[in-house]
UniProtKB/Swiss-Prot annotation:
Binding, a divalent metal cation: 38-39, 132
PROSITE patterns the record matches: RNASE_H_2 (PS51975)
Domain RNase H type-2 residues, every copy: 32-223
Cellular component terms per the entry's GO annotation: cytoplasm; ribonuclease H2 complex
Keyword S-adenosyl-L-methionine appears in the UniProt entry: no
CDD domains: RNase_HII_bacteria_HII_like
Protein name, entry field: Ribonuclease HII
Gene Ontology molecular function, alphabetical: manganese ion binding; RNA binding; RNA-DNA hybrid ribonuclease activity
Record text on cofactor binding: Manganese or magnesium. Binds 1 divalent metal ion per monomer in the absence of substrate. May bind a second metal ion after substrate binding.
Length: 251
């Protein structure tokens, strides 16, 4: 059989029409089954980063017509889709990276490590992996980054919902363990209410000490993520890094 040239593409793919386009093309090319990977909790100054991987069965696509980027869905819609996804998926895995580990290795490295762990934890090995936004080296299968992936590929959208629902539930639990911060409402993001609580109560164990606003409350100098984490990320071979963007993550 003659080898196909130019497929799979080596560059970052942008959003294509329809939530099944990318998976269908890969499966037609003999590169299935296709797993999607996405995260929830990159931006908040408190709580974990949650990363999910999801390998959808072909029959699942018709049953999951409501799939979309989790951020575009209501909380009720996400909760309704969550058990459907876990029931219809060929395999799925959720990884929780706590605040202390984010502080130790940086948010971008934590994101990449979480994606590696999630894919490695799938009980069925994917033929191909679609990641949301940037390249992830060291995966157990060939992969392709997709800009806007959670709105472009059904498997990434499914992973997005698994990650978001899991993290939201964790933040509700943390609200009862650390009362006064309002974690159940804002989920650890820098809302005015959270900022006021942080100033009033000081950081708890779930606040990320590497975030500028948390460090300022502790009287510590802000870190420069570009300097602190870039060497580690580049050493991992990440060409399309978000380190520079993360330099302003708590601004």
């Amino acid at each position: 059989m003659t080898a196909r040239t130019g497929w799979p593409p080596r560059m970052v793919m942008r959003k294509a029409g329809g939530l099944r386009t990318l998976e269908a093309a890969l499966i037609r090319g003999g590169l299935g089954p296709v797993a999607g990977v996405d995260e929830a909790g990159r931006g908040p100054c408190a709580g974990p980063l949650v990363v999910a991987a999801c390998l959808l069965a072909p029959k699942a696509y018709d049953r999951l017509a409501g799939l979309d980027d989790s951020k575009k869905l209501t909380e009720a819609a996400r909760e309704e889709l969550y058990p459907v996804i876990t029931r219809l998926a060929l395999a799925w895995e959720v990884v929780v990276i706590p605040a202390w580990e984010i502080d130790a290795i940086g948010i971008h490295v934590a994101n990449i490590e979480g994606m590696r762990r999630a894919v490695a934890g799938l009980r069925q090995r994917p033929g191909y992996v679609l990641t949301d936004g940037f390249r992830v080296p060291g995966l157990a299968a060939p992969s392709l980054p997709v800009i806007g992936g959670d709105a472009a590929a059904a498997c990434i959208a499914a992973a997005s919902i698994l990650a978001k629902v899991t993290r939201d539930r964790i933040m509700v639990e943390l609200d009862s363990r650390h009362p006064g911060y309002g974690f159940a409402a804002h989920k650890g993001y820098n809302t005015p209410e959270h900022t006021a609580a942080l100033q009033r109560l000081g950081p708890c164990s779930e606040h990320r000490r590497s975030w500028r606003n948390v460090r300022e409350r502790l009287g510590l100098r802000p870190l420069d993520p570009t300097v602190e984490y870039a060497e580690t990320v580049l050493a991992d071979g990440v060409a399309d890094s978000r380190v520079a963007a993360d330099a302003a993550h708590a601004g």
